[in-house]
Amino acid sequence: MDKKKEHPEMRIPLQTAVEVSDWPCSTSHDPHSGLGMVLGMLAVLGLSSVTLILFLWQGATSFTSHRMFPEEVPSWSWETLKGDAEQQNNSCQLILVESIPEDLPFAAGSPTAQPLAQAWLQLLDTARESVHIASYYWSLTGLDIGVNDSSSRQGEALLQKFQQLLLRNISVVVATHSPTLAKTSTDLQVLAAHGAQIRQVPMKQLTGGVLHSKFWVVDGRHIYVGSANMDWRSLTQVKELGAIIYNCSNLAQDLEKTFQTYWVLGTPQAVLPKTWPRNFSSHINRFHPLRGPFDGVPTTAYFSASPPSLCPHGRTRDLDAVLGVMEGARQFIYVSVMEYFPTTRFTHHARYWPVLDNALRAAALNKGVHVRLLVSCWFNTDPTMFAYLRSLQAFSNPSAGISVDVKVFIVPVGNHSNIPFSRVNHSKFMVTDKTAYVGTSNWSEDYFSHTAGVGLIVSQKTPRAQPGATTVQEQLRQLFERDWSSHYAMDLDRQVPSQDCVW
């Protein structure tokens, strides 16, 4: 493996330090902050809507001279989801899913989530009309990277599954980042040849970041969201964590609105609107979450988004969601994330950004919350991260009731050194005694201010009538503690082989 190569998640384009406008999102400061924006929007829409539409789109489009992408006539109104999703009764069911890399065994009897490869195929089996996917890039075959390895078979089976859906006239719609990182992959060309609709979103030109989201909306009823890319390595060589929600049209159609922000920006000459039209607005957010039973368990849930410029009115900003989860904790905050930097990561000159770092310290000091941070270390780790991790660890003072612990999780390379950009814990989640957060972003400023991502925030209470029911935050806590107590999680003073981790 060439140490000078960069992992796809680290190849986010350099950004200039641009101030982000105050977009009409739900913020942690004022639950009614969008009201004035809505009134102003109503006054302006009559004069500006025609101009805005003409500026955003100039006719039907095809992205390449080979006409890989079907021509479409864009519209501010998103594509209507097929079927009768709005009429379906919600009987929401949430399932945690994960990928455990090959040759990464845990102790017998350890808690597990449903295997991601199996869960994705089962989710696609439910599709009757449409599958909408927001993705960073696609690389589902070993040939994409010149690797002949049996561990690529699950990704190849997934690609075949998508082709089968298209042959059954099930719509497959993909919004992905442009330019793609998987430059030798033919996955999207293959799907387009079978009738998939694909748009590439030049996110760097629009927000200064990338389209880093990883979620699916199936039939306007079912959802996947999590850390896994559309990459065969995410199924067998990289540790991932996500969630699938079945039969939850209210949440699914709310997440669909975020998908549609990407979709409309994937047209030629698209620009970010100063104010998103009302049909992109959300009424499900931090201050007004969806409330109802998930498998009989009382649940609140909502989606957040980043960056602020992709938050129409009512959408909670991802950073505000993360801070809100921390603020609500009373006993513990456990975080598992690939990278942790209290700085910018992709600007020409790094800028200090202590927002999340301060929030963890404040929770530990002010409320006596037990903080645990599990960060990944692998062959492509930037070793400057460890100074920040040691600084946070040094804040711990058990005699004063301040508990902050930091470990690194290392996936041994073993005999898999022939597979580049693998063998890493890629999860991005947080769990407290009150709430579970499953996201798509690493923790540095750029992911929240410039890069497109989403978060799922869920809180459950065990009903008295179901004393044996396990809340999603309890399930996620068990998975975190399994990882934390395993021999793959190491204290910051440990020495490890450089093949597995650049310390």
Curated annotation (Swiss-Prot):
PTM comment text: Highly N-glycosylated.
Location within or outside the cell: Endoplasmic reticulum membrane; Golgi apparatus, trans-Golgi network membrane; Nucleus; Early endosome
Species lineage: Eukaryota, Metazoa, Chordata, Craniata, Vertebrata
Reported regulation of activity: The exonuclease activity toward ssDNA substrate is Ca(2+) and Mg(2+)-independent, but it is inhibited by Fe(2+), Cu(2+) and to a lesser extent Zn(2+) ions.
SS bonds (residue pairs): 92-248, 377-501
Record-given protein name: 5'-3' exonuclease PLD4
Species for this entry: Mus musculus (Mouse)
Membrane topology value: Single-pass type II membrane protein
Active site as annotated: 212, 212 (proton donor), 214, 219, 426, 426 (nucleophile), 428, 433
Annotated catalysed reactions: Exonucleolytic cleavage in the 5'- to 3'-direction to yield nucleoside 3'-phosphates; a 5'-end 5'-dephospho-ribonucleotidyl-ribonucleotide-RNA + H2O = a ribonucleoside 3'-phosphate + a 5'-end dephospho-ribonucleoside-RNA + H(+); a ribonucleoside 3'-phosphate-2'-3'-cyclophospho-GMP + H2O = a ribonucleoside 3'-phosphate + 2',3'-cyclophospho-GMP + H(+); a 5'-end 5'-dephospho-2'-deoxyribonucleotidyl-2'-deoxyribonucleotide in single-stranded DNA + H2O = a 5'-end dephospho-2'-deoxyribonucleoside in single-stranded DNA + a 2'-deoxyribonucleoside 3'-phosphate + H(+)
